[in-house]
Amino acid sequence: MFFSAALRARAAGLTAQWGRHVRNLHKTAMQNGAGGALFVHRDTPENNPDTPFDFTPENYKRIEAIVKNYPEGHKAAAVLPVLDLAQRQNGWLPISAMNKVAEVLQVPPMRVYEVATFYTMYNRKPVGKYHIQVCTTTPCMLRNSDSILEAIQKKLGIKVGETTPDKLFTLIEVECLGACVNAPMVQINDNYYEDLTAKDIEEIIDELKAGKIPKPGPRSGRFSCEPAGGLTSLTEPPKGPGFGVQAGL
């Protein structure tokens, strides 16, 4: 009994000590509306079952092509790509768009809701033209992603989870985007911008404001994800076909 109490006391002390350094892992979904507060939908004037939404004729053709990728009778497997298509058409996913996806794929609406509320890539509230997603998990944090986040907030005059008054930029924090070797990095719409400094992200924002699309990828001079100090192997052009093969072969 005493041992358990001691453990609980120690755990409480560690929590208090480190709590100010630990980010709330659930808040990403809360901030970008991917799940909304407690993943609950509440009708609003701009987001309710009567909000106008229908796929364009071109997108109906795309849906037909998507569904053909899956076995007959398994349209439900296409929920993710068709939700993505709806979001790309509309900019975000109102409940009416989810209902349309369910109708087109002939699945219960709940099967669509559970997907749309699970993945943070689906936006359940409007976002700006440029959706800035800053990775702040461990590798990026160790590479000073906080300075990138602060630079964006200062440059745009908004906080995490907010959109600029001109509807041009929305800023959120996200969990790992899978480009840890190029930390710190951000995703803006579909593009990755890596090996960033505060100055880099300010320049990227300036280009976007000017109507340009900055070149994606590392900003440090690296081609891809090779070692920052230069190649340590495969430093010469590859040999041609047959190199090193025994003469008898």
Swiss-Prot record:
Core subunit of the mitochondrial membrane respiratory chain NADH dehydrogenase (Complex I) which catalyzes electron transfer from NADH through the respiratory chain, using ubiquinone as an electron acceptor. Parts of the peripheral arm of the enzyme, where the electrons from NADH are accepted by flavin mononucleotide (FMN) and then passed along a chain of iron-sulfur clusters by electron tunnelling to the final acceptor ubiquinone. Contains one iron-sulfur cluster. Keywords: 2Fe-2S, Acetylation, Electron transport, Iron, Iron-sulfur, Membrane, Metal-binding, Mitochondrion, Mitochondrion inner membrane, NAD, Oxidoreductase, Phosphoprotein, Respiratory chain, Transit peptide, Translocase, Transport, Ubiquinone. Binds 1 [2Fe-2S] cluster. The modification N6-acetyllysine is found at K61. Residues 1-32 form a transit peptide. Belongs to the complex I 24 kDa subunit family. [2Fe-2S] cluster binds at C135, C140, C176, C180. It comes from Gorilla gorilla gorilla. PROSITE patterns: COMPLEX1_24K. Transmembrane segments: none annotated. SUPFAM superfamilies: Thioredoxin-like. This is NADH dehydrogenase [ubiquinone] flavoprotein 2, mitochondrial. It is a peripheral membrane protein. Its main location: mitochondrion. One of its GO terms (molecular function) is NADH dehydrogenase (ubiquinone) activity. Residues 213-249 are annotated as: Disordered. Its EC number is 7.1.1.2. It comes from the Eukaryota. Pfam families: 2Fe-2S_thioredx. It is found in: Mitochondrion inner membrane. It catalyses: a ubiquinone + NADH + 5 H(+)(in) = a ubiquinol + NAD(+) + 4 H(+)(out). GO terms for biological process: mitochondrial electron transport, NADH to ubiquinone. PANTHER family: NADH DEHYDROGENASE [UBIQUINONE] FLAVOPROTEIN 2, MITOCHONDRIAL, NADH DEHYDROGENASE UBIQUINONE FLAVOPROTEIN 2, MITOCHONDRIAL. Its cofactor is [2Fe-2S] cluster. GO terms for cellular component: mitochondrial inner membrane; respiratory chain complex I.
